[in-house]
Amino acid sequence: AMTTALVGAYMNIPVAHLCGGDRVIGNVDDQVRHAVTKLSHLHLVTNRESFERILRLGEQPFRIFDVGNPGLDRLLEVPVIDAVKLSQRLGFTIVEGEPLVILIQHVISTEIDQAYEQMKISLDAVSELGIKTILSYPNSDAGGQQMIRANHEYDSLPFLYVAKNIPRLEFVNLMRRASCLLGNSSAGILE
């Protein structure tokens, strides 16, 4: 997004920015998002707070449109698959009606040195609960390898399914069945 916005600004090509004004505390994403906002011409925000935040950045109100999050519309397009088929696709048994936790935790870019310990705290909680848990790898930000190292210390738990990547069809269907989303991912908020 940053490169596109820079090129658009230098080439005098109008740029529309989606999700400007959204917040991620403790992550470099805020700085990048605000920079892209300042380089963009149209702002398609997901909520009223983001609208107000962009106004405070000095953008003109007629250039800001509260359109909501298009990711929500895309969720409706994802077909529902039953627990048996989902289990087959994952290679991990999901039982309809049983509690299910999804753990997605990413490194806080201002706390990279604490990534391993933070992941262990979440994994200790999951271990104590003993509930079926889907654990997704963190993103590729700095510190992610420390989190993955912590993940490996728990991957022998029989109720834990560790996935490097979960395809969208399976992920959305897991979220439909989840009793709890644990961690600091925006997936549960945005989707």
List each language-model region with its residue ranges.
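A donor-sugar binding/catalytic signature common to diverse glycosyltransferases
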Residues: 2, 18, 43, 168-191
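Donor-nucleotide binding loops and adjacent catalytic segments primarily
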Residues: 81-179
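Active-site and donor-binding regions of nucleotide-sugar-utilizing enzymes
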Residues: 1-61
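Phosphate- and divalent-cation-binding pockets in alpha/beta enzyme and binding domains
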Residues: 3, 53, 74, 112, ...
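A nucleotide-sugar donor-handling region in carbohydrate enzymes
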Residues: 40-115
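Short, acidic/turn-prone active-site loops that include or flank metal/cofactor-
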Residues: 20-24, 69-70, 187
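Short active-site oxyanion
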Residues: 39-42, 62, 160, 178-180
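Alpha-helical segments flanking ligand/cofactor-binding loops in enzyme cores
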Residues: 6, 33-34, 124, 172-173, ...
